[in-house]
């Protein structure tokens, strides 16, 4: 299964360069090992997608709860995905 997510330019570039192999996401969607995460570069300054796309296979999943990235209400309801990619 393919799962599409937008990614900001700095994080997209790190992933493209192979310097970033994990991705932290609010766990409000279905995903499993073997799925393909389709990262679509999104520029928050322009409010639009750049057209660059990167596909990565999900190698490992760990669901955790963190309060540094999302509202406590959202974290309590969903948790987070820590997604390791190949």
Where are each of the predicted segments found?
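Short, basic/aromatic beta-hairpin or loop at an interaction surface
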Residues: 1-21
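A structural micro-motif recognizing beta-strand termini
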Residues: 25-28, 86
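Short coil-to-beta-strand transition motifs
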Residues: 48-57
């Amino acid at each position: 299964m393919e799962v599409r997510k937008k990614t900001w330019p700095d994080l997209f570039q790190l992933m493209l360069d192979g310097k970033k192999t994990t991705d932290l996401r609010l766990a409000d969607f279905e995903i499993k090992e073997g799925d393909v995460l389709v990262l679509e570069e999104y520029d928050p300054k322009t409010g639009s997608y750049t057209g660059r796309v990167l596909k990565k296979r999900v190698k490992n999943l760990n669901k955790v709860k963190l309060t540094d990235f999302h509202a406590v209400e959202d974290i309590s309801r969903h948790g987070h995905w820590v997604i390791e990619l190949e």
